[in-house]
Design a protein with these regions (language model features):
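Bacterial N-terminal signal peptides
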Residues: 8-17
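Bacterial N-terminal signal peptides that target proteins for export
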Residues: 1-9
Length: 208
């Protein structure tokens, strides 16, 4: 009798599991889809954790209150220019989850996005960097990648874009990144980023 009861309970439990609809893994994101909006914001989908190159020469303040473009904070980076790892270049990848170089299934389907928009400013002006997304290869890899090309910052906030036309955005593991070479700023540099977002029309994630 007990075996029969256990069997009936097992059948009931299995029927409940089968009745739960499967999550649609093909669902696309809603836009604007923020990489960074404010330090600690729940709307941030990526984390500036992938320090690379001469990573020992990079300092970051993810909740900088020094004149953010919008909201309460921006993210501040300082690169001293020192060849701490002997490479003469440095950068930071915004990853999901933190420190994910393709070992964890953390990519987002951003199909439908038309461009990445973001605001940047330099502490002195004249700072030379390249901004990009994608580029992580591993057990889990980015489906695409693109770049802004070389950018020279000004002291005032300025909006920049990375076009996404013809990009495969079905799996975006690195939502954003910056890189620079020591030769571009031998004395180092400090710069600020804010309102980094994927958008799907002619508009953008502008400051409110």
């Amino acid at each position: 009798m007990k075996k029969f009861v256990y069997f009936c309970v097992w059948i009931w439990a299995v029927s409940l599991i089968l009745a739960v609809p499967a999550q649609d893994s093909s669902a696309h994101a809603t836009f604007p889809f923020y990489v960074y909006k404010d330090g600690g914001s729940k709307t941030n989908h990526y984390i500036p954790s992938g320090f690379t190159g001469d990573y020992g020469a990079i300092k970051m303040d993810e909740k900088c209150r020094d004149n953010p473009k919008a909201g309460e904070t921006c993210v501040k980076f300082t690169y001293t220019g020192e060849p701490t790892q002997g490479l003469n270049w440095a950068g930071v990848f915004f990853q999901n989850p933190a420190n994910n170089w393709g070992t964890v299934d953390g990519g987002n389907d951003l199909t439908g996005a038309k461009k990445i928009t973001f605001f940047a400013r330099g502490d002195k002006g004249g700072e030379v960097l390249e901004f990009k997304f994608g580029g992580i290869n591993g057990a889990f890899s980015d489906s695409g990648g693109g770049t802004s090309g070389q950018v020279v910052l000004t002291k005032e906030w300025k909006q920049y874009e990375i076009p996404l036309e013809d990009q495969d955005l079905s799996y975006v593991l690195c939502g954003f990144a910056w890189v620079t070479e020591q030769k571009n700023s031998p004395g180092g540099m400090t710069f600020f980023l804010d309102e980094i977002a994927y958008v799907n029309d002619s508009g953008a994630a502008l400051a409110k």
